[in-house]
Amino acid sequence: SSFLDRVREESLAYAQKVGSDLQENVYRAMKILAEGFFAEPSNLLSHSEEDIRSVQDNSMRLLYRLLFIFYAESRKLLDTDNRRYREMSLKKLKEEIAEKLDQGEAPLAVRSTYWEGLRDLFRLINDGSEAFGYSREEFYIPAYDGRLFDPEKNPFLSSKRIGNSYLAEAIDLLARSDGERGKAYVDYSSLDIRHLGSIYEGILEYRLHRAEESMAAVREKGKEVWLPEKEAGSRKVTDRAEAGRLYLVTDKGERKATGSFYTPEYIVKYI
């Protein structure tokens, strides 16, 4: 095969790997965001069914927002080379978080400065740069015309908070994956919109539950399924949720969504 064919095959293989790594990390990030919303006392959330659903839906939306911004920044739709934008960017935040975590510094759960910064970024994307008083010469972002960033359509995300430790861990899971030489930044520009779409679709399959008793995820017929830990027997346990902790499960009782790659462009309704 020609050199170009080989490059194409390699980049496709890389995108597939990024996609599958990301699916596992997205799963973990969603659980951490949910835990973060519950852990913040000022959010006044109980573990009622209603609050669990609300946290599930909004952790999902927050994930969509973060994935959207990672993708848009990687494609320079949001220009991280612009000094004004860079100060507010997710790129700057992910680098700051990575540096802290690599130095063994744990961000504090009681502070929510990362969240405040993100909320400004969400507002910038929703309202556009001119609403912030920037001239077109300084930099320009048109107002985003969808529901995803609209504060009125997402009152939970406009009023609740999440502590730095939870947000840092979730953002780092989305920003970096474990490579052969340690952690490396995920190249979102290698994903096409369908890859991102299949990850979005996978997220939609998740339901947040609170474990009534200790739960274990075990491999069964090539899939990971959740069951009470006492029923796990000698099977290899891949994940656990202690009683009272949150865990994510699909409608089929599986631990992880199977979001197939190369699904049609249904994602367009989000973006």
Segments (PLM) and residue ranges:
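Preference for the N-terminal adenyl/adenosyl cofactor-binding alpha/beta module
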Residues: 1-270
